């Protein structure tokens, strides 16, 4: 039978890594996960995440509504200039200029919440990755028979993969909010007389506020579900065949 020859010192390094990983995982389950569940549950109960009147989230839009008379005069001057100057490049440059209102700030209330949320997203993904690696290292050599414990490992691994996909999507969700809000602010600045664009900015802020609360809930639930399912099946996950077998990896 073909065998891969591994130097004893190399195997020793892998064994040290594996033992260290197992210790970290057991510490996570024994203390860190329960602590995070409690912390995130407390976060969800804070006034900052329980705003009943979402209109209080409204951030000021420093975009003045133009005077119709002055705008008409400005439009006439623009038409006159276009007649005199047919340079397409110059027209393109004029269109790319920023709005006359100056810079428009982010919604500070949303930004403050996101500054608290993003480290939590990073943390839960890293811990999930560590626990997933620990689980993979418990998978025994592929053999016929007595595979019920392996089936349990596979089910838990599927759950972890699903959680990882959901949590990774939070980064994209946050970036999408800023992109969409920036587009809405740009439209409101270019067409300040259109109230719908101004309202769109506020609607996006309210939607993101609701999403932030849901993301905190999902992170808390991820810790709780991982803690629960691993604790309930710890023996099967660690020793799927009732005894320690060689690693599949």
From Swiss-Prot:
Keyword Ribonucleoprotein: no
SUPFAM superfamilies for this protein: Proteasome activator (SSF47216)
Induction entry: By IFNG/IFN-gamma.
One GO cellular component, as annotated: proteasome complex
Entry keywords, A to Z: Proteasome
Bias (Basic and acidic residues): 68-98
Gene Ontology terms: biological process: antigen processing and presentation of exogenous antigen; regulation of G1/S transition of mitotic cell cycle; regulation of proteasomal protein catabolic process
Region (Disordered): 60-102
A molecular-function term among this protein's GO annotations: endopeptidase activator activity
Keyword Lipid metabolism: no
Protein family per UniProt: Belongs to the PA28 family.
Job of this protein: Implicated in immunoproteasome assembly and required for efficient antigen processing. The PA28 activator complex enhances the generation of class I binding peptides by altering the cleavage pattern of the proteasome.
Known partners and oligomeric status: Heterodimer of PSME1 and PSME2, which forms a hexameric ring. PSME1 can form homoheptamers.
Protein name from the UniProt record: Proteasome activator complex subunit 1
Organism the protein comes from: Homo sapiens
Gene transcribed to yield this protein: PSME1
């Amino acid at each position: 039978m073909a065998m891969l020859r591994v130097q004893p010192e190399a195997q020793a390094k892998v064994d040290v890594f594996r033992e260290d990983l197992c210790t970290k995982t057991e510490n996570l389950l024994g203390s860190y996960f329960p602590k995070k569940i409690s912390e995130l549950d407390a976060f969800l109960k804070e006034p900052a995440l329980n705003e009943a009147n979402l209109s209080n989230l409204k951030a000021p839009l420093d975009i003045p509504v133009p005077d119709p008379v002055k705008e008409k005069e400005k439009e006439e001057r623009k038409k006159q200039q276009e007649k005199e100057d047919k340079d397409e490049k110059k027209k393109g440059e004029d269109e790319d200029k920023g709005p006359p209102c100056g810079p428009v700030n982010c919604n500070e209330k949303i930004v403050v919440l996101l500054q608290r949320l993003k480290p939590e997203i990073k943390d839960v993904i890293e811990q999930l990755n560590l626990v997933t690696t620990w689980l993979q290292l418990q998978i025994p050599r592929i053999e016929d028979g007595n595979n019920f414990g392996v089936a349990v490992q596979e089910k838990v691994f599927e759950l972890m993969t699903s959680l990882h996909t959901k949590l990774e999507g939070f980064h994209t969700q946050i970036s999408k909010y800023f992109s969409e809000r920036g587009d809405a602010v740009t439209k409101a600045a270019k067409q300040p007389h259109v109230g719908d664009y101004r309202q769109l900015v506020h609607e996006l802020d309210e939607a993101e506020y609701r999403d932030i609360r849901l993301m905190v809930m999902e992170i808390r639930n991820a810790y709780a579900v991982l803690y629960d399912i691993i604790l309930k099946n710890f023996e099967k996950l660690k020793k799927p065949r009732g005894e320690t077998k060689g690693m599949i990896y």
